[in-house]
């Protein structure tokens, strides 16, 4: 993973550099974001880190709803770095506009972030609109670094964001680096 970070940090690119910032380990993702903050043009936010950034700008996501959740703990631990990124790089942060969750019938359902009034279920993927936007940005970038999945890709219902963005990267003509075991597993699975 260090080599992946270094390959982005030490190269010069003429076009846009994009980082897909997702996964379960928000602290790791946010640390990489701050390390690469002056090299990356677009941070495509998803996973737990995406919810924490949305929480920091006032949305009702990124909060614990169960005893085993770690949102609140990770938010407190990363608040200063999140706030720094929001203040220093507001135009580079690309937030999800919709999120997916499991409805009462066990199906994938989506909601716009603006319509979330209280977090009463887990968000398990970025929504279709966000996926389309992220895939377009990634496909038009000169370099893309993927650090974490955008959703719970192990469950096919919530693999949509991760799979479609990875496919857009693969179909594009860009320098790409994948960091992290979960993202590598997603590539192997799909």
Task: Please tell me what each predicted stretch does.
Residues 1-190:
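Active-site loop-to-helix "anion-binding N-cap" substructures in soluble metabolic enzymes
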């Amino acid at each position: 993973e260090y080599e992946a970070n270094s390959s982005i940090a030490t190269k010069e690119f003429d076009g846009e550099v994009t980082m897909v910032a997702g996964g379960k380990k928000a602290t790791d993702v946010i640390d990489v974001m701050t390390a690469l903050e002056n090299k990356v043009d677009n941070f495509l936010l998803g996973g737990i880190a995406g919810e924490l950034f949305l929480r920091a700008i006032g949305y009702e996501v990124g909060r614990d709803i169960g005893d085993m959740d770690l949102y609140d703990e990770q938010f407190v631990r990363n608040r200063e770095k999140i706030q720094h990124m929001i203040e220093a790089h507001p135009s580079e942060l690309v937030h999800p506009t919709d999120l997916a969750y499991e409805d009462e019938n066990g199906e994938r359902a989506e909601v716009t972030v603006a319509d979330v009034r209280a977090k009463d279920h887990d968000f398990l993927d970025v929504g279709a609109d966000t996926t389309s936007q992220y895939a377009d940005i990634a496909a038009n970038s000169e370099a893309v670094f993927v650090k974490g999945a955008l959703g719970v890709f192990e469950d096919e219902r919530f693999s949509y964001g991760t799979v479609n963005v990875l496919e857009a990267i693969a179909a594009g003509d860009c320098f790409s680096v994948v960091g992290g075991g979960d993202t590598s597993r997603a590539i192997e699975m799909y």
